[in-house]
């Protein structure tokens, strides 16, 4: 696979690696960005552990809470201009309310919205506004108390990041603080038991490779891996993370002080995981010249 300057730039920005190191990592891994990040980490050349994911899709996430039940819905548009459109926002708000009564995004597409299905409403709005729109996903959360938070809100209850937190005990104040923490830190799971085993094993293999590169004795390597995996779990799981409001406490400890237990959460970000192809300027000009 041909390694482009844009690929090298993206890898450098996501890891802090030097230009030649980034290029070598991509060559060694046939252009696979995630594998290149892991390769750099193994060699001790990546200053940042997080992998960058391009999230160029636009739209809105809307959150609605009704008693002990909450829902987050993502509706995508082609441009941010449409996401700021009042008609689009009203439609998204209606879709989110309809989502409270269904369990899957497929059911939501067929749900009633003002006498039409959600799918038909979307089709009509595409014709009216003149831009493609998609109902991408929905997620539901239930608990004794469910609290919502929207980061970078476009209007009430919708924005670029929507968070729902389920609590047992406590009050809305601690729930709102935890929700803001989730929006900012983006934990992978609630607790160690909830972490995807595949993600844990992949990280373990990376740490094994890093430790063995040190050339230290096996017993020392084992302790290094154990310590680094504990750190990985603490940084990846909500309950074990340092609370952004008070870093002296974990989220679990802060909630406990407020008389609450966090039982679940959902975080939905617009465009998360979607990659949009980008042409460089020369390619755009060439395509335009061809008519």
UniProtKB/Swiss-Prot annotation:
Belongs to the EF-Ts family. InterPro entries: EF-Ts_dimer_sf, Transl_elong_EFTs/EF1B, Transl_elong_EFTs/EF1B_dimer, Transl_elong_Ts_CS, UBA-like_sf. Residues 79-82 are annotated as: Involved in Mg(2+) ion dislocation from EF-Tu. This is Elongation factor Ts. Its main location: cytoplasm. GO terms for molecular function: translation elongation factor activity. Keywords: Cytoplasm, Elongation factor, Protein biosynthesis. HAMAP family: EF_Ts. It is found in: Cytoplasm. One of its GO terms (cellular component) is cytoplasm. PROSITE patterns: EF_TS_1, EF_TS_2. The gene is tsf. Associates with the EF-Tu.GDP complex and induces the exchange of GDP to GTP. It remains bound to the aminoacyl-tRNA.EF-Tu.GTP complex up to the GTP hydrolysis stage on the ribosome. Signal peptide: none annotated.
